[in-house]
Amino acid sequence: MSETSTTTHISQVGTVMVPVSDQDLALDFYVGKLGLEKTADTPFGRGDRWVEVTPRGAQTSLALILPQEGEEVGISTRVAFASDDVDADHAALSERGVDVDEEVMRMGDPIPPMFFFRDQDGNRLLIVQRG
């Protein structure tokens, strides 16, 4: 019996898809409030658009996609952004009218400070203090 290799050529997470009800409103939120860069906005398929936003300097992007049949918006995405200063980001997003948790969670070492926030569709995302 021969061994089966479990090796792949996967090297990173490239794109995470986040379902949104309106791509223009999503761009206003992710670019205008979060400060991400719009890195793609092009026709896709039959009348659809492929819209991507990316944190500055990051290799992983978010695709802001319209939900397919049976999919919903307003989900817990499990997307976590890294930040060098979660307290400053919490304050800034709150000032911009973003739906953020009341305060930054602090559970003690080794768990870093973090907070959840919601986009214009209620999709739940997280910002975590980097190392």
Residue ranges and their predicted role:
Residues 17-19, 54, 80-84, 128:
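Short hydrophobic/aromatic beta-strand micro-patches
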Residues 57-62, 122-125:
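Short, charged/polar, Gly/Pro-enriched secondary-structure boundary elements
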Residues 56-60, 69-72, 86-88:
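Short, charged/polar surface micro-motifs in flexible loops or helix N-caps
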Residues 23, 86-87, 120:
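Residues at or immediately preceding the N-termini of alpha-helices
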Residues 29, 87-92:
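Short amphipathic alpha-helices within nucleic acid-binding modules
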Residues 2-9, 15-18, 39-42, 49, ...:
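Vicinal oxygen chelate
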Residues 10-11, 17-59:
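Core segments of cupin and vicinal oxygen chelate
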Residues 13-15, 74-79:
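Eukaryotic phosphotyrosine signaling hubs
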